[in-house]
Amino acid sequence: MVVLSYLKNQNKHFNAIKNQQITIAAKANIVICIAFCLFWTIYFSFAEMWFIVCTDIFFTTMSIFSLFLIYIHRISAGILVSQIVLFVFPVVFCLIFDVATIDHPRVAHLFLPAGAILGYLNYRRDPNALQLILIILSIAAFIFFSGSAFTLDGAIPLAESIRAYGGWIAISVATLMICISIFVMQLELQIENKLVQDLRLALSKQQFELFYQPQVNSCEKIIGAEILLR
């Protein structure tokens, strides 16, 4: 049927647009994450806090690797790696470095929703169990760290002087990443609604016409009819 062919072509077109949009969102979030980690790597290097420096270098390397995967068109794998980074990075910092105090609350857990939303966008285009597990874990960890001051016994709290401005930087970066993902999600919804709107508009304007095309056998005898909607 002509309509089915139209729908298939439109779906391919919309899927290509959605893939492009989620790729842009993933690249933007990963680049922001890399810049954030590099900033603190340099800062803590001057402060000679080598344990945090090594941690930041590891997460920066993983983020660069995820960006590389996306550039070679392994989009799902790249986003999955970046989602792992956006899960492990906040959890490690919440347990070891980002210890809540009376003057400064914990902020590292704010990166967890960014990873969950990015993972959800990827799950919509390429569902898999690991992606879903990471989304659930990210949400659960965000809830846990939001309502708890739990840290490890051997935690190494950051100095109050660092947290005074570092917290605002982390909040701003996490919020920016969340906003980017939400914006792309909104664009996806608009794309999906566009096809529905086109069909409704065509129906309201009575632009569809019904045709009957005869079906014949080898003896050229009519044995039925094919209904076409144009």
Regions found by a protein language model. Name each.
Residues 1-20:
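Short, Lys/Arg-rich, polar N-terminal cytosolic tail immediately upstream
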Residues 15-22, 68-82, 123-130, 219:
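Membrane-interface helix-boundary motifs at transmembrane edges
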Residues 28-103, 110-117:
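Hydrophobic transmembrane alpha-helices and their membrane-interface boundaries in multi-pass
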Residues 38-58, 99-105, 125-177:
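Alpha-helical transmembrane segments and their interfaces in multipass membrane proteins
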Residues 107-109, 190:
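Short helix-capping and inter-helix turn/linker motifs at the boundaries of alpha-helical repeat units
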Residues 165-198:
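Juxtamembrane or sensor-core-proximal signal-transducing alpha helices
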Residues 191-230:
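Active-site core of bacterial EAL-family cyclic-dinucleotide phosphodiesterase domains
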